[in-house]
Amino acid sequence: MFSPDQENHPSKAPVKYGELIVLGYNGSLPNGDRGRRKSRFALFKRPKANGVKPSTVHIACTPQAAKAISNKDQHSISYTLSRAQTVVVEYTHDSNTDMFQIGRSTESPIDFVVTDTVPGSQSNSDTQSVQSTISRFACRIICERNPPFTARIYAAGFDSSKNIFLGEKAAKWKTSDGQMDGLTTNGVLVMHPRNGFTEDSKPGIWREISVCGNVFSLRETRSAQQRGKMVEIETNQLQDGSLIDLCGATLLWRTAEGLSHTPTVKHLEALRQEINAARPQCPVGFNTLAFPSMKRKDVVDEKQPWVYLNCGHVHGYHNWGNKEERDGKDRECPMCRSVGPYVPLWLGCEAGFYVDAGPPTHAFSPCGHVCSEKTTAYWSQIPLPHGTHTFHAACPFCAHQLAGEQGYIRLIFQGPLD
């Protein structure tokens, strides 16, 4: 979980606030992680604070005056109320916080570039033709530089001119204390799990976060003009396992503390080798099955285990029970005669998605990603935003919508006959 430098010199390790992991990727982007575009992003304490906090409010601005203020070499948020009036809130440097920005833009203010997740996509080209719904400057996370290093999330990010513009059509309003606030077009949704991110976790309620970090119930649809009700007892403070939805991609927030209890990639590799050492066999061909190495996680191997999703019986690939008159991938299991999809099994390699370090005994349906029982049980009950107003459970390793009664199955391996 840690870079070699950190393992060798723990005293020199910079403070890690946490990590953001994009749901739908199994350890890296399909074509590999490059620069600021990757499947996970670690937030470390910066050498020098770059956080900002609100200061002066300019209320009755003409568009020209608003432009003059926002052209200053400091951060500002502009709320356009009408063609004649704009409220500009200036932001000043905050030496106690670090700011990290997330969005689709590749411009320099964005620390973590996020593109739309296409379920099961094998290459970045699969995602390019889709019209993106992720904002170019989607959100910002502000981390306290001093213990306990609290992280808070806010909708919208500052652009290259250090501005955030909320146009006439954006939902915005004046708060009871005379300040301004607003929502971005497609919104930033957050869900904090109950009982943290552990094997006892339960899903929380999805909320929308405003530009100023206030918490609201969801709008009727993603981009509706009318905001939801303010939820005053909840905050924008991220906790281990919080989910952040940017309308096109969902991110999992893991704290440094939470990650220290997560299985390492080495541990997952040891579990893989343990399964393979037991020499599971195909009940039809009697050939030994083996999960391919984590590096080869998207090319079907000849020894790869396959599973009948209706019953969980694990086989090697064979043509038994493959009747042409059946639609699609449905096959009859030779062991119990149940008919259903027959798919290859893949190990879940993204350790940050695991809620425990249990053995890989269960698989998500219909994709065949394998992980611990508690991890499949957890993700199968999490409703993830899909489109503009629907929610469904999905596999965290590939973003495929889960199917079947539970969304996952217990795997039944046959050991060697000798």
Curated annotation (Swiss-Prot):
Chain positions covered by the region annotation Ring-like domain: 311-399
Catalytic activity: S-ubiquitinyl-[E2 ubiquitin-conjugating enzyme]-L-cysteine + [acceptor protein]-L-lysine = [E2 ubiquitin-conjugating enzyme]-L-cysteine + N(6)-ubiquitinyl-[acceptor protein]-L-lysine
Modifications made to the protein after synthesis: Phosphorylation by IRAK1 and IRAK4 enhances its E3 ligase activity. Phosphorylated by ATM in response to DNA damage, promoting localization to DNA double-strand breaks (DSBs) and ability to mediate 'Lys-63'-linked ubiquitination of NBN. Sumoylated.
Record-linked Pfam families: Pellino_FHA, Pellino_RING
GO cellular component: cytoplasm; cytosol; nucleus; site of double-strand break
Known outcome of mutating T127A: Decreased phosphorylation by ATM in response to DNA damage
Molecular function GO labels: ubiquitin protein ligase activity; ubiquitin-ubiquitin ligase activity
Impact when changing S121A: Decreased phosphorylation by ATM in response to DNA damage
Residues in FHA domain copies: 13-200
UniProt subunit comment: Interacts with MAP3K7. Upon IL1B treatment, forms a complex with TRAF6, IRAK1, IRAK4 and MYD88; this complex recruits MAP3K7/TAK1, TAB1 and TAB2 to mediate NF-kappa-B activation. Direct binding of SMAD6 to PELI1 prevents the complex formation and hence negatively regulates IL1R-TLR signaling and eventually NF-kappa-B-mediated gene expression. Interacts (via atypical FHA domain) with RIPK3; preferentially binds to the 'Thr-182' phosphorylated form of RIPK3. Interacts with RIPK1 and IRAK1.
Function: E3 ubiquitin ligase catalyzing the covalent attachment of ubiquitin moieties onto substrate proteins. Involved in the TLR and IL-1 signaling pathways via interaction with the complex containing IRAK kinases and TRAF6. Acts as a positive regulator of inflammatory response in microglia through activation of NF-kappa-B and MAP kinase. Mediates 'Lys-63'-linked polyubiquitination of IRAK1 allowing subsequent NF-kappa-B activation. Conjugates 'Lys-63'-linked ubiquitin chains to the adapter protein ASC/PYCARD, which in turn is crucial for NLRP3 inflammasome activation.
Name assigned to this protein: E3 ubiquitin-protein ligase pellino homolog 1
Taxonomic lineage from the root: Eukaryota, Metazoa, Chordata, Craniata, Vertebrata
